[in-house]
Amino acid sequence: KDIQVSGHAIECRIYAEDPLNDFAPNPGKITGYRSPGGPGVRLDSGVYMNYTIPTFYDSMISKLVTWGRTRDDSIARMKRALSEYIILGVKTTIPFHKAILRNPNFISGDLNTHFIDQYKNGIESEMVNVIAEDLENVNKMKSTFMPSKKIAAISAAVGSYLNTAKNQQMNKK
């Protein structure tokens, strides 16, 4: 009979577009990719590492949806999901969504159909901050996962140890 509200959902459409350049399409090859997940997170996408965003079609990469019992829960999940979402090689609308989710008027639900135009300057300056933070985080991740001689030596030693132990077990039988 009556429709009952049972939580809140937010959808962010992720496009290969440059939000600081009037959302101009940004086709190209995805050189790094990690999708978000977890409770209350849904991702509808067809892209993957080394996928090429074509110039001839819609530049949509994915639809990222979060659900929570409250608006605040849904916003928190979307912030987390966007922070986990890594797409390298093309510019995306992820910084735009992160900037919107930091806007106090969005958080409080003080919205109207002119929201983006009303807060354009603040959103753009926040996107610049987001992009700088994301770049710093990507550089940290790169240095964390760079192969090192110590790691290679330890990996080789562990592999050798496991093979020796396996062979000794086989010889006992």
Where are these predicted regions, by residue range?
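Catalytic cores of soluble metabolic enzymes centered on carboxylation/carboxyl-transfer
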Residues: 1-173
